[in-house]
Amino acid sequence: MTIPALALQIPALLVLAAVAVAGSSFAPEADDALRSAKQIYVGTRRKDGMPSAVVPVWFMFDGEAIYFTTGPESHKARRIVRGSPLLVWVGRRDGPHFVGRAELIRDPAVAARMAPEYDRKYWIAWLGFFRPNPERVREGKTVIVRVLPGS
């Protein structure tokens, strides 16, 4: 691995090394940021223990958990199934961060609940683009990732 490549991994390594938030709620700083942020940045852990690339995703936060969608065969989904913790930065790559427990859910009702929130937060979702679709969840083309505090 080259020095520049390693430098890009250092923030993710620091989060992996951090102590997870205890209890059943997010830390106050993360909770506040989740209520106003338009996106989160997420990463997982590879089989070799190294952090994956960190990517921005749109999300819904209901005060208890974070929800976002991904493809069932995506690297994120496969690593979550394998038990990888989810590394989360809120709002920006240097924003509040934590390690979360992620699970895949396949409930079209959750996608239906997410859609109006996406419409409110993201103008392009209001047009029908990139919005959670219950039918795609029902057909297995999309899965929902639920993220809870802790690892």
Describe each PLM feature range:
Residues 73-151:
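Short, structured beta-strand-loop surface elements
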Residues 26-29, 55, 76, 114:
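Hydrophobic alpha-helical segments typical of transmembrane helices
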Residues 33-35, 51-53, 60, 81, ...:
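Extracellular/periplasmic catalytic domains that process cell-envelope and extracellular macromolecules
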Residues 13-24:
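Hydrophobic h-region of N-terminal signal peptides that target proteins for export
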Residues 37-72, 86-89, 97-101:
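Short beta-strand segments
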Residues 28-30, 45-46, 130-135:
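Short, P/G- and charge-enriched loop/turn segments at secondary-structure junctions
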Residues 25-34, 39-40:
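Short, basic/aromatic recognition patches
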Residues 1-13:
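Bacterial N-terminal signal peptides that target proteins for export
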